[in-house]
């Protein structure tokens, strides 16, 4: 420190500074003690009620860096203020964001104490002498130097590319570089350090941090200062020290500035040195006083904890009652103030906020996609797995690459220009704080994106090299979808915080003279034992916040409904928790974690080329639900099958809903409701269950010989494949099969008898049959009178061209009944009028298990995307009747016949030939 400054800050001034600091801490203590008790009570309440943060997030949260991680190290020129000379120093910046200066690299490596250590909280980075001179003159209120011009710069530069670090109440830092690239890298990293040091403390969720910030707010309100404060940066010692310096500064300027002698640069240097010495004195005393104050508060809350926990219900009830009383007094003037001074401007402020903020997040997305594409192209050219892993490690460092991230941050720096009117209308000059918070969120989201990408891709790096580029592309698309949702969530949070931060001071100041004086009379509603945990000022502020929050959420929700800047609505069918399960990349064989739609698409001959089989990494079980243009896959659940008698099966193709089947054959409907109540059926397959009739004791054997399902559709004749034998079925066989079917109506007596026998069999828990019909195609031929139509909601209407693959419902945890497997063969028979009767013969087998994966080929633009988590069909609402039903009359006593008429029109009807065994699960690699 220079001699001039040392001579001015004598012992008398030091004593004065200590006295003012002690008085400030004493005045601040009651505010901090009150807020400490309130925050501790809220903390205990949250712990007791087990409150959770319901903020939804898709991307995995990147773990914090290990302490001591080096972000930057290089040798450069630094101006040594003590000797006023430029020296070559070895600069190291770790993830505590302190700038450490060492004599040399060897000194750093052997663990020497740094020559200087700078925490640049509240600082500003400049790269030109002109910018620095303007800023430093602004904070040097010297009346005698108003007309004086500097003949030389404040610091002579040894190199062409300087970096100036301006700091409030501290001496400034000066660095110099040979090349512009080095200057850009260092200045960008310094900006990162400043952003984190400014806001990382305020992001803490500890009740002590919340208590301190609330205490600072109430302390400043008592002096007539509302809203944010540009000095609320750094940790609690730095913030409180700046609060004291704010009171000291006028006195120091009056007493010391006139005594400074010399040229302007000399006086300026002396003034900055004087401020630094005063600030160090204040900071030391504040640190001691704040630690003592914390110990007192901790002792107080330790005594209160028992009361808080035992009286929690009473405390909550008392606070709610007090809130109602104060709200009745505040609501009318607060709403009037909002309606006149805030609400008319919220939409325009939001519009100005959305542009730069959304542009910044879009730039982050584009940067991530660009880096991943370069990684993929590099591997495609070299096929070098080692180089790919190295590139992946570099990708993980992308959020810390200040040079690459700087163009993203620059997009948001346009915000102060867009919000110039706020300074006059709402007196909000601190838009820079909003910019810095937004930039921190952008960096955090990039960290989550690259971390999620690395987690999802890592399992595939050991696989075949030819599949890695496809895996990279799939994982990239998956992460980008997650990024879009998380970006929308974070941006809405930024908008909400900014709108309240900008407009709340206006409401607070408007009501301060009318409502605040009335608060004292409401203290009578607080029990004496609870006066430490409930304060009327806090309740009053919460009410104002909630009123304003409602107004801000209205305009944000409206913007989301209008899809402005790709904002998503809050009521979308998305998970409320982070998709952390994506680390479980391996799906066990037979597991139901994988989407049924994905398993179907893995064996679809007509599936799109880009739909490669995969595990959970490529599935979108939740996001698909939010896409209105993607129809859900249809699934059919056969609940029961009558053994003789009239049976009616209805198939519902209502728009946007699942395909349900309901048997309405008299007493058998009770059996249907049983299965529906039980959820999904065993092995995710449609099951045909038939009770054992008493008319023929050997009915099970008879059913093994023949169990027929008849599907009546309007179509032209098509060639079907025998699923069991894997060979086409000639027309002669179709006619023979038709001869086995008796379309005549059965007698009512037989129905009644079968119903009685069915109840007897259920009571004995007889083992029914299970018919698993693979490859049964419910797509139909086009009708001459109908045309393809598809509902805008993404579901399929009654005349949809193709219902898409009929999807297997998920396996029930507790199947209602155990069933025997069966082998099913399908046949078509032409009928008059252009109808084709599609029959399915189900032959029970002991060891055969068949899957039901009907396939419907469609045009590429008509392929219905399968949703990830499908509802169990037929088990939700037994009243969902099919839209097209037809009676099935059968005189055969032991045949189970379904007649399903589907009037959906398609170009062709095709049944693909599959193995009898269950569909092969995707490999662990895919």
From Swiss-Prot:
Region called Disordered, residue ranges: 604-699, 719-889
Composition-biased stretches (Basic and acidic residues): 733-745, 756-767
GO biological process: one example: positive regulation of translation
KW Cytoplasm (keyword) present: yes
InterPro entries: Niban-like (IPR026088)
Record keyword Cytoplasm present: yes
Subcellular location(s) per record: Cytoplasm; Membrane
CDD domains: Niban-like
Composition skew (Polar residues), residue ranges: 661-672, 840-854
UniProt keyword terms in alphabetical order: Cytoplasm, Lipoprotein, Membrane, Myristate, Phosphoprotein, Stress response, Translation regulation
Modification type Phosphoserine: residues: 578, 581, 595, 601, 640, 699, 755, 923
Phenotypic effect of disruption: No obvious phenotypic abnormalities but mice show increased phosphorylation of Eif2a and decreased phosphorylation of Eif4ebp1 and Rps6kb1.
Inducing factors: By endoplasmic reticulum stress-inducing agents such as tunicamycin and thapsigargin in liver, kidney and cerebrum.
Biased composition (Low complexity): 784-797
Highest taxon listed in the record's lineage: Eukaryota
Primary residence: cytoplasm
UniProt GO cellular component terms: cytoplasm; cytosol; plasma membrane
Membrane topology, record value: Lipid-anchor
Residues with lipidation of kind N-myristoyl glycine: 2
Misc note: 'Niban' means 'second' in Japanese.
Family per record: Belongs to the Niban family.
Purpose of the protein: Regulates phosphorylation of a number of proteins involved in translation regulation including EIF2A, EIF4EBP1 and RPS6KB1. May be involved in the endoplasmic reticulum stress response.
Name of protein: Protein Niban 1
Organism: Mus musculus
């Amino acid at each position: 420190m220079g001699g001039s400054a040392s001579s001015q800050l004598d012992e008398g001034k030091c004593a004065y500074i200590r006295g003012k600091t002690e008085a400030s801490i004493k005045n601040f203590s009651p505010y901090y003690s009150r807020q400490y008790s309130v925050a501790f009570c809220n903390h205990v309440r949250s712990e007791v009620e087990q409150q959770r943060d319901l903020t939804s997030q898709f991307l995995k949260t990147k773990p914090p860096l290990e302490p001591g991680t080096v972000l930057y190290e290089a040798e450069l020129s630094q101006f040594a203020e003590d000797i006023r000379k430029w020296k070559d120093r070895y600069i190291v910046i770790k993830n505590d964001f302190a700038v450490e200066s060492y004599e040399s690299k060897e000194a750093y490596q052997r663990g020497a104490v740094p020559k200087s250590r700078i925490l640049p909280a509240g600082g500003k980075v400049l790269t030109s002498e002109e910018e620095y001179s303007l800023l430093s003159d602004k904070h040097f209120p010297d009346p005698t130097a108003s007309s004086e011009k500097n003949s030389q710069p404040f610091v002579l530069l040894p190199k062409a590319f300087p970096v100036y670090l301006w700091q409030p109440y501290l001496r400034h830092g000066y660095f110099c570089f040979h090349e512009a690239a080095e200057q850009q890298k260092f200045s960008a990293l310094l900006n990162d350090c400043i952003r984190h040091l400014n806001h990382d403390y305020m992001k803490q969720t500890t009740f002590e941090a919340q208590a301190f910030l609330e205490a600072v707010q109430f302390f400043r309100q008592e002096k007539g200062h509302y809203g944010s404060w540009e000095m609320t940066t750094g940790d609690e010692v730095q913030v409180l020290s700046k609060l004291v310096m704010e009171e000291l500064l006028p006195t120091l300027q009056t007493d010391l500035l006139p005594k400074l002698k010399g040229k302007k640069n000399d006086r300026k240097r002396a003034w900055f040195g004087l401020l630094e010495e005063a600030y160090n004195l204040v900071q030391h005393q504040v640190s001691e006083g704040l630690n003592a104050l914390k110990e007192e508060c901790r002792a107080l809350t330790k005594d209160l904890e028992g009361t808080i926990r035992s009286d929690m219900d009473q405390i909550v009830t008392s606070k709610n009652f007090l809130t109602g009383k104060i709200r009745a007094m505040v609501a009318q003037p607060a709403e009037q103030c909002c309606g006149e001074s805030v609400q008319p401007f919220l939409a325009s402020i939001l519009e100005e906020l959305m542009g730069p903020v959304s542009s910044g997040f879009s730039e982050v997305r584009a940067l991530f996609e660009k880096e991943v594409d370069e990684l993929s192209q590099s591997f495609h050219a070299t096929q070098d797995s080692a180089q790919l892993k190295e590139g992946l490690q570099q990708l993980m460092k992308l959020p810390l690459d200040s040079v690459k991230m700087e163009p993203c941050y620059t997009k948001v720096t346009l915000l102060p220009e867009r919000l110039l009117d706020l300074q006059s209308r709402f007196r909000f000059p601190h838009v820079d704080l909003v910019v810095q918070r937004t930039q921190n969120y952008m960096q955090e989201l990039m960290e989550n994106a690259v971390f999620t990408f690395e987690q999802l891709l890592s399992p595939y790096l050991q696989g075949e090299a030819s599949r890695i580029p496809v895996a990279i592309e799939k994982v990239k698309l998956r992460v980008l979808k997650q990024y879009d949702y998380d970006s929308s969530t974070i941006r809405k949070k930024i908008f909400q915080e900014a709108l309240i931060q900008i407009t709340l001071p206006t409401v607070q100041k408007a009501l301060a003279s009318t409502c605040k004086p009335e608060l004292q009379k409401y203290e009578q509603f607080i029990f004496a034992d609870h006066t430490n945990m409930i304060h009327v000022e806090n309740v009053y502020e919460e009410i104002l916040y909630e009123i304003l929050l409602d107004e801000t959420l209205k305009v944000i929700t409206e913007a989301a409904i209008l899809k402005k800047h790709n904002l998503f609505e809050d009521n979308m069918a998305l998970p409320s928790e982070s998709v952390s399960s994506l680390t479980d990349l391996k799906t066990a064989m037979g597991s139901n974690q994988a989407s049924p739609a994905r398993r179907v698409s893995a064996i679809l001959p007509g599936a799109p080329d880009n739909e490669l089989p995969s595990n959970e990494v490529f599935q979108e079980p939740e996001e698909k639900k939010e896409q209105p243009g993607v129809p859900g896959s249809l699934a059919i659940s056969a609940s029961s099958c009558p053994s003789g008698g009239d049976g009616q099966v209805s198939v519902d193709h209502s728009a946007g809903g699942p395909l349900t089947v309901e048997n309405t054959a008299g007493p058998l409907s009770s059996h249907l409701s049983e299965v529906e109540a039980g959820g999904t059926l065993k092995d995710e397959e449609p099951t045909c269950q038939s009770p054992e009739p008493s008319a023929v004791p050997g009915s099970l054997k008879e059913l093994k010989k023949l169990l027929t399902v008849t599907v009546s559709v309007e179509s032209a004749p098509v060639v079907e494949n025998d699923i069991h034998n894997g060979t086409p079925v000639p027309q002669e066989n179709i006619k023979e099969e038709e001869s086995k079917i008796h379309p005549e109506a059965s007698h009512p007596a037989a129905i009644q008898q079968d119903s009685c026998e069915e109840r007897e069999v259920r009571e004995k828990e007889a083992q029914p049959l299970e018919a698993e019909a693979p490859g049964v195609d419910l797509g139909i031929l086009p009708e001459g009178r109908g045309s393809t139509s598809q509902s805008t909601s993404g579901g399929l209407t009654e005349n949809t061209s193709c219902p898409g693959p009929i999807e297997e419902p998920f396996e029930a945890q507790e199947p209602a009944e155990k069933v025997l497997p069966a082998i099913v063969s399908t046949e078509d028979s032409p009928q008059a009028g252009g109808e084709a009767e599609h029959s399915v013969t189900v032959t029970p087998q002991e060891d055969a298990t068949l899957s039901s994966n009907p396939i419907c080929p469609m045009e590429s633009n008509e392929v219905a995307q399968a949703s990830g988590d499908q509802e169990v069909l037929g088990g939700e609402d037994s009243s969902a009747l099919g839209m097209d039903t037809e009676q099935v009359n059968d005189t055969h006593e032991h045949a189970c016949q379904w007649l399903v008429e589907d009037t959906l029109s398609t170009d062709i009807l095709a049944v693909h030939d599959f193995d009898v065994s269950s569909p092969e699960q995707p490999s662990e690699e895919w």
